[in-house]
């Protein structure tokens, strides 16, 4: 089932500047990178989402993975739901403070129960918008009916073959694993995302020549990334007014999973065009253009960053809670304490 996105309404929303949010997120992550000695101060200066939306095709709908509930319980214990977790916290649970990265073991077969077989009872009756996301992210209709007896093949085998085992391994871990509440609004969507749009990203940095000698020369460097190509299988879960997003694997031109293991199964960005410029072009016209080694370094770092941030078993979480409602809840709790 394909989804029609109101791309213009999404990127021009009054609620949030999506392009600036993404630019700021990427820029903060680049500030934390270990750069080569001859490159310093990399920053993301501009980001335009363009006018061409990604193509989204729903493959399957199921209950959310239990790992997402582990984070929900951890967040509930701390009485704080941040809009976006940093990488080291994203996979944290009360009993598992670090990311499990067992790349040799396949997914526990028990996880397959989270993929409902075709022909079962409707999984999302009365769905109005995909994932119940805000109205600015969709134009309110899809190309099929709102009830979803799926007729497309389930990609369960792909997920089982690439998803690293994060199921509890000991009786103690199983006892500590949170039991998901029976919330009928919770759901998870497995979908293909294909993008060949006109997003543009501007990057600036400083190149150090003759480093570390005393005669070091500093040259400004500008890069413009465009023609980004993505074709991946991803999951998006909606749990208690929070959205979780993780990329499972890359797909080839026939929409088959790329046969790789571990995080190497993912590039996320299949192809990208880079226009680079090094030097002070505006002063003496002596700028160097399209320096291949620097270009490749930037692309490799962006791919590594994306894999660390959103490739399973990592994910990003975006809270859809209204700040006003949070303030009201806090005031109500304060009033109750005053009464006692």
Curated annotation (Swiss-Prot):
This is Mitochondrial distribution and morphology protein 12. Its main location: mitochondrion. The SMP-LTD domain is a barrel-like domain that can bind various types of glycerophospholipids in its interior and mediate their transfer between two adjacent bilayers. It is a peripheral membrane protein. The lineage of its organism: Eukaryota, Fungi, Dikarya, Ascomycota, Saccharomycotina. The keyword Membrane applies. One of its GO terms (biological process) is mitochondrion-endoplasmic reticulum membrane tethering. It comes from Yarrowia lipolytica (strain CLIB 122 / E 150). Residues 89-106 have a biased composition (Polar residues). Residues 1-321 form the SMP-LTD domain. GO terms for molecular function: lipid binding. One of its GO terms (cellular component) is ERMES complex. InterPro entries: Mdm12, SMP_LBD. Keywords: Endoplasmic reticulum, Lipid transport, Lipid-binding, Membrane, Mitochondrion, Mitochondrion outer membrane, Transport. The keyword Zinc-finger does not apply. Residues 79-107, 161-184, 319-340 are annotated as: Disordered.
């Amino acid at each position: 089932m394909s989804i029609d996105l109101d791309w213009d309404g999404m990127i021009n929303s009054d609620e949030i500047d999506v392009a600036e949010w993404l630019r700021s997120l990427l820029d903060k992550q680049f500030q934390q990178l270990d750069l080569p000695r001859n490159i310093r101060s990399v920053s993301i200066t501009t980001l335009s989402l363009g006018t061409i939306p990604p193509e989204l095709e729903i493959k399957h709908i199921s209950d959310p993975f239990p790992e997402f509930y582990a984070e929900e319980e951890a967040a509930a214990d701390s009485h704080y739901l941040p809009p976006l977790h940093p990488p080291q916290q994203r996979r944290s649970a009360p009993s598992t403070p670090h990311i499990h990265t067992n790349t040799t073991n396949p997914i526990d077969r028990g996880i397959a129960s989270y993929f409902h077989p075709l022909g079962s009872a409707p999984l999302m009756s009365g769905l109005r918008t995909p994932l119940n996301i805000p109205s600015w992210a969709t134009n309110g209709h899809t190309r099929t009916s709102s009830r979803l007896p799926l007729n497309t093949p389930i990609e369960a085998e792909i997920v089982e073959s690439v998803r690293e085992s994060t199921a509890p391994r000991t009786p103690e871990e199983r006892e500590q694993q949170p039991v998901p509440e029976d919330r009928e609004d919770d759901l998870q969507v497995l979908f293909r995302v294909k993008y060949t749009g006109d997003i543009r990203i501007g990057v600036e940095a400083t190149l150090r020549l003759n480093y570390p000698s005393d005669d070091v020369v500093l040259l400004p460097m500008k890069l413009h990334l465009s023609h980004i190509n993505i074709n991946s299988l991803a999951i998006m879960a909606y749990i208690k007014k929070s959205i979780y997003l993780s990329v499972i694997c890359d797909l080839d031109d026939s929409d088959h999973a790329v046969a790789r293991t571990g995080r190497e199964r993912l590039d996320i960005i299949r192809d990208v065009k880079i226009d680079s410029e090094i030097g002070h072009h505006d002063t003496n016209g002596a700028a160097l253009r399209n320096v291949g080694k620097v270009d490749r370094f930037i692309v490799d770092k962006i791919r590594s960053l994306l894999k660390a941030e959103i490739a399973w078993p990592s994910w990003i979480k975006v809270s859809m809670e209204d700040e006003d409602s949070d303030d009201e809840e806090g005031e109500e709790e304060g009033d109750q304490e005053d009464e006692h």
